[in-house]
From Swiss-Prot:
It is an enzyme of class 3 (hydrolase). CDD domains: cysteine_hydrolases (cd00431). Hydrolyzes ureidoacrylate to form aminoacrylate and carbamate. The carbamate hydrolyzes spontaneously, thereby releasing one of the nitrogen atoms of the pyrimidine ring as ammonia and one of its carbon atoms as CO2. Signal peptide: none annotated. Keywords: Hydrolase. The active site is at D24, K133, C166. InterPro entries: Isochorismatase-like_dom, Isochorismatase-like_hydrls, Isochorismatase-like_sf, RutB. It comes from the Bacteria. The lineage of its organism: Bacteria, Pseudomonadati, Pseudomonadota, Gammaproteobacteria, Enterobacterales. Belongs to the isochorismatase family. RutB subfamily. Its EC number is 3.5.1.110. Transmembrane segments: none annotated. The keyword Zinc-finger does not apply. It comes from Escherichia coli (strain K12). This is Ureidoacrylate amidohydrolase RutB.
């Protein structure tokens, strides 16, 4: 068992019965020219987040944790995104951006596109699981719950983008399904102003889970791991 220093209190878990979840580290969310950038969100400070996720993934894999990668998006025709009868059609900034700029149709968050791909620095390895998801929450219309329960996994460590959207949505849904969720704050990035990050982390540590950071996480898995990985 491992005890991780976190807010509001430490949490104990078995790494080999836990999963590190990497949420939507796609060009869409972390790279200039991707969907968030084109929609007017600032992605200029995502590079340190990518590096921190690399560090966390390496430490988690060495400790025997399952690594799960999410990719958010839809088919090329956007059938999976829902039509006018879906609130997603009206609230998705990617869909709204494409309606405003028709030349982008088929380029944002479409499976097979550059936008949909994971950033070059983050490459899933054999034994990892890569899951597509059609909505903010990784539990909605995906086999995530079944994958976790069949492996006896109850503790989830979250990284990725966006803290205040897909990361928080997935962690919240996990809370309702009796999963213990921890977010590594320096391995996440918000969509929007900095207060959105602070608000999401406040919600998580106060109501739905725990908040820690990459160095503390790596040190908890192995006291010498962070120095070695860094």
């Amino acid at each position: 068992m491992t005890t991780l220093t976190a807010r509001p209190e430490a949490i104990t878990f078995d790494p080999q019965q836990s999963a590190l979840i990497v949420v939507d580290m796609q060009n869409a969310y972390a790279t200039p020219g991707g969907y968030l950038d084109l929609a007017g969100f600032d992605v200029s400070t995502t590079r340190p987040v990518i590096a921190n996720i690399q560090t966390a993934v390496t430490a988690a894999r060495a400790a025997g944790m399952l690594i799960i990668w999410f990719q958010n998006g839809w088919d090329e025709q956007y059938v999976e995104a829902g039509g006018p009868g879906s609130p997603n059609f009206h609230k998705s900034n990617a869909l709204k951006t494409m309606r405003k700029q028709p030349q982008l149709q088929g380029k944002l968050l479409a499976k097979g596109s550059w936008d949909y791909q994971l950033v070059d620095e983050l490459v899933p390895q054999p034994g990892d699981i890569v899951l597509p998801k059609p909505r903010y929450s990784g539990f909605f219309n995906t086999p995530l719950d079944s994958i976790l329960r069949s492996r006896g996994i109850r503790h989830l460590v979250f990284t990725g983008i966006a803290t205040n959207v897909c990361v928080e949505s997935t962690l919240r849904d996990g809370f309702f399904l009796e999963y213990f969720g921890v977010v590594l704050e320096d391995a996440t990035h918000q969509a929007g102003p900095k207060f959105a990050q602070k608000a999401a982390l406040f919600n998580i540590e106060t109501f739905f889970g725990w908040v820690s950071d990459v160095e503390t996480f790596c040190d908890a898995l192995s006291p010498t791991s962070f120095a070695h990985i860094a």
